[in-house]
C-alpha cells in the first residue's frame, strides 16, 4: 500500500507532509519552499501554480486566482461572495446552479476545479520525494466549514486524482502536531487558527496515559470568511483612498495597479510585524494626461492596527462561545496554540494573551502545524501511528424543516463524530402521500435563516389522517463530517436515503468530467514539458555548434560551414513551432551536418593530448635529477 499524504489546503498558502521514519516531515516543493502560495494562473498554453503564478500576477491579474478557498462550496448570492466580487481582480460569476464560479479566458470553472491544481502540485511534491505514485490523502478544512464546503473539498481531491481518505479540521490537526509527543497527563488546549481566509477556535482535550493518546474536541466555533485576506484588503483600501486624495485617481478601476497594490500591502503587513514603520513605494503605478503617477505612502504599525482592530475583536466572540459550549472558563485552558500566518501579527498575539491570561506557545510553526497533523492522521489511518484516538465534532447543528418553517434539530453542534440520530415525524395534512425532507445546518430556529443542505422526497405513503403515518428520519455523520440522511415509512418499510448534496455543489457527472479533463491536461502538460525539453536541447546544440564553428576557423571547409549554417537555421525555425518531432528531426540533421566539425574538434583534442604527453616526459626527466634528502625528526628533550 502506498503512503497516505497530509495536505493543508490553505487560502493563502498550502503545505504537504508525510510520515518519514515515524515522524511527520514537511516536504519542499520544486522551488525549494516548504509552503506553496495557493495561487493558480492560466495563460494561453499552460496552467501555473504557486510561486511562479504569484510572480506573473501583476501582468496577468484577471487570469490569476488566489483565495479560491473563500469561494469553495458557496453560492454566488452569499454576502461573503458579493464582498469579494467587488474587490477581486478576477471575474467571479454565478454558475447555472447558483454556485460561485470563476471565469478565465472565456472558460467557466468551479472552485474545486481550480483548487485541484494546488492539490496536484502537492501530490507531485510528495511523489518526487517518495519516488512513487501517491493516490491517497488526508486534507484539512477549517473546523467551521459546513457540509457543502467539505463536499467541495473532497471533490477537489478527486479532480486532482486523490482518494481523500479523511477530511480533518485544521485546529484538530494542529493539536495533533503539538500533542503527539506529550506522552503523560491531561491538557486542555485552545487552538486559535487565524489563516489567510478563515478563522477557527477549537477547545481540545489531550489525554495521554501509558502511551495511549486521545484527542477529544470539546467545542469549536469560527468564521469561514475572516482571515489575512481581510487584513490585506483593509490596507489596500487605505492605500487606494490615500492615493485618490493626493492624485484624484481611483486605482480600483485598474486591475494591474490593484495587483501591484495587493502585493505591496501584503509585504508591508508582514514587515510591520517586526518593525514599527515601513513605506509603500510603487513608481509608475498609473498615469493620466499629465504623465505617470507614483505611489509613496508611509505606514506605521499603529496605523495598521487601527485599520484592522475590529477584525481582531471579531475573533474574540467565537472564543467566548466555544468556551461556553465546552462548559469551561479561561482558567481551565492549560495551553494556547496559534495557527495560521496572520497570528504572527503582534496585535493578534496581544489580544489572545489578554483574553486567555497567558502567553501562547511559541514552539508550534503556524504555517506547517496543520500539514504535520494531517500527516499524523494519515499515519493513524494507514496503521503506521498507533495508540492515537481522534474524536472530532460537527461544528454546526443539523436538522430538518418542520411545520411552521421551524428547524427541528436532530444533531446538536459540537457532537462527537461519527454519530447517528433519528426521530419520528408525521404528516401535516390528511391523506398526504409524500413528504419532503428539507435538511438544514445552523443554529437559528427559523428554517430559512439556516444553511439549506438539500432536500428529497419520500413518496408512496398510504393515505391516512394527519399525524398518523410514522416517518423515521435518520441522520448519520461520517468521520469526515459529511452527512447521510434516510427517511423510512415505518408502516410500509419504504425507504429513501441519500448522501446530502446541497442544491448547489457539483454533480457526480460534473466531477467525473473534471477528473477526465484533469487527466487530459496531465497528458497535455507532459507533452508540453517534453516539447520544452526538446526546444532547450536544440537551442543548446545550436549555441555549442556556433562556438565550435568559430573555434574551427579555416580548418572547416566553407562547404561544411554552409551546410552547418543551413542546419542551424532549420533548427531555429523548428524551435519557434510546437512540433516536437520536427524539432528532434532538425536537431538530428544538425548533428549529422556537424560530422566534419566533430572530426576537427577530436583531432585538435588529440594534438593537445600529444603536447601534454611531451610536457609530462620533460617533467619526469627533471624529477629524475632531484636527490631525496634524508631528514631525521628532532624531538625536544624534555627533562
Curated annotation (Swiss-Prot):
**Molecular functions (GO terms):** ATP binding; ATP-dependent protein folding chaperone; unfolded protein binding
Q: Does the keyword Phosphoprotein apply?
A: yes
The induction field says: By stress conditions e.g. heat shock.
Residues that bear Phosphothreonine:
198
Under the heading PROSITE patterns, the entry gives:
HSP70_1, HSP70_2, HSP70_3
What the entry lists under InterPro entries is as follows:
ATPase_NBD, Chaperone_DnaK, Heat_shock_70_CS, HSP70_C_sf, HSP70_peptide-bd_sf, Hsp_70_fam
Q: Pfam families of this UniProt entry?
A: HSP70
NCBIfam families for this protein: PRK00290.1, PRK05183.1, prok_dnaK
Q: What does this protein do?
A: Acts as a chaperone.
**What family name appears in the similarity comment?**
Belongs to the heat shock protein 70 family.
Put simply, this protein is called: Chaperone protein DnaK
Origin species:
Shewanella baltica (strain OS195)
Q: Gene encoding this chain?
A: dnaK
Amino acid at each position: 500500500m502506498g503512503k497516505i499524504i497530509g495536505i493543508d489546503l490553505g487560502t493563502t498558502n498550502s503545505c504537504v507532509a508525510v510520515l518519514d521514519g515515524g515522524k511527520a516531515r514537511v516536504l519542499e516543493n520544486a522551488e525549494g519552499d516548504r509552503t506553496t502560495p495557493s495561487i493558480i494562473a492560466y495563460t494561453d498554453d499552460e496552467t501555473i501554480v504557486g510561486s511562479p503564478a504569484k510572480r506573473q500576477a501583476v501582468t496577468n491579474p484577471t487570469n490569476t486566482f488566489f483565495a479560491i478557498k473563500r469561494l469553495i462550496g458557496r453560492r454566488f448570492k452569499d454576502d461573503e461572495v458579493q464582498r469579494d466580487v467587488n474587490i477581486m481582480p478576477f471575474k467571479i460569476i454565478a454558475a447555472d446552479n447558483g454556485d460561485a464560479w470563476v471565469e478565465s479566458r472565456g472558460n467557466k470553472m468551479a472552485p474545486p476545479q481550480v483548487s485541484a491544481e494546488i492539490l496536484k502540485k502537492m501530490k507531485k511534491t510528495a511523489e518526487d520525494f517518495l519516488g512513487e505514485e501517491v493516490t491517497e490523502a488526508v486534507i484539512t478544512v477549517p473546523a467551521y466549514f459546513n457540509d457543502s464546503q467539505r463536499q467541495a473539498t473532497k471533490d477537489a481531491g478527486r479532480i486532482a486524482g486523490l482518494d481523500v481518505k479523511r477530511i480533518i479540521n485544521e485546529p484538530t490537526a494542529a493539536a495533533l502536531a503539538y500533542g503527539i509527543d506529550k506522552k503523560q497527563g491531561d491538557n486542555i488546549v485552545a487552538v486559535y487558527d487565524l489563516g489567510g481566509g478563515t478563522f477557527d477556535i477549537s477547545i481540545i482535550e489531550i489525554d495521554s496515559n501509558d502511551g495511549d493518546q486521545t484527542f477529544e474536541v470539546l467545542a469549536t466555533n469560527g468564521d469561514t470568511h475572516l482571515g489575512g485576506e481581510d487584513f490585506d484588503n483593509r490596507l489596500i483600501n487605505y492605500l487606494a483612498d490615500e492615493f485618490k486624495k493626493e492624485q484624484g485617481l481611483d486605482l480600483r478601476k485598474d486591475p494591474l495597479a490593484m495587483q501591484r497594490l495587493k502585493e505591496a500591502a501584503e509585504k508591508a503587513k508582514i514587515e510591520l510585524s517586526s518593525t514599527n514603520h515601513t513605506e509603500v513605494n510603487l513608481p509608475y503605478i498609473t498615469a493620466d494626461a499629465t504623465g505617470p503617477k507614483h505611489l509613496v505612502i508611509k505606514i506605521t504599525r499603529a496605523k495598521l492596527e487601527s485599520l484592522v482592530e475590529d477584525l481582531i475583536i471579531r475573533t474574540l466572540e467565537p472564543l467566548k462561545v466555544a468556551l461556553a459550549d465546552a462548559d469551561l472558563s479561561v482558567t481551565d485552558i492549560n495551553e494556547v496554540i496559534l495557527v495560521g500566518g496572520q497570528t504572527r501579527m503582534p496585535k493578534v498575539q496581544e489580544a489572545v494573551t489578554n483574553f486567555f491570561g497567558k502567553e501562547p506557545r511559541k514552539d508550534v510553526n503556524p504555517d506547517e502545524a496543520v500539514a504535520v497533523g494531517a500527516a499524523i492522521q494519515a499515519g493513524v489511518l494507514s496503521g503506521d501511528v498507533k495508540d492515537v484516538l481522534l474524536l472530532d465534532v460537527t461544528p454546526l447543528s443539523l436538522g430538518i424543516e418542520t411545520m411552521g418553517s421551524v428547524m427541528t434539530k436532530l444533531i446538536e453542534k459540537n457532537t462527537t463524530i461519527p454519530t447517528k440520530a433519528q426521530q419520528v415525524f408525521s404528516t401535516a395534512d390528511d391523506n398526504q402521500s409524500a413528504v419532503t425532507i428539507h435538511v438544514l445546518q445552523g443554529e437559528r430556529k427559523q428554517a430559512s435563516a439556516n444553511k439549506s443542505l438539500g432536500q428529497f422526497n419520500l413518496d408512496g405513503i398510504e393515505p391516512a389522517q394527519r399525524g398518523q403515518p410514522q416517518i423515521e428520519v435518520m441522520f448519520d455523520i461520517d468521520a469526515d463530517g459529511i452527512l447521510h440522511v434516510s427517511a423510512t415509512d415505518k408502516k410500509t418499510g419504504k425507504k429513501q436515503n441519500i448522501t446530502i448534496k446541497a442544491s448547489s455543489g457539483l454533480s457526480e457527472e460534473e466531477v467525473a468530467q473534471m477528473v477526465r479533463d484533469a487527466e487530459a491536461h496531465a497528458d497535455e502538460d507532459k507533452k508540453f514539458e517534453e516539447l520544452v525539453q526538446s526546444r532547450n536541447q536544440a537551442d543548446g546544440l545550436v549555441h555549442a555548434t556556433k562556438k565550435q564553428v568559430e573555434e574551427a576557423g579555416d580548418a572547416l571547409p566553407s562547404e561544411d560551414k554552409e551546410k552547418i549554417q543551413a542546419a542551424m537555421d532549420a533548427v531555429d525555425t523548428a524551435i519557434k513551432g510546437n512540433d516536437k518531432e520536427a524539432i528532434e528531426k532538425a536537431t538530428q540533421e544538425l548533428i549529422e551536418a556537424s560530422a566534419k566539425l566533430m572530426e576537427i574538434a577530436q583531432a585538435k583534442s588529440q594534438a593537445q593530448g600529444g603536447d601534454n604527453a611531451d610536457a609530462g616526459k620533460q617533467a619526469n626527466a627533471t624529477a629524475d635529477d632531484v636527490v631525496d634528502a634524508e631528514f631525521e625528526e628532532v624531538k625536544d628533550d624534555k627533562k
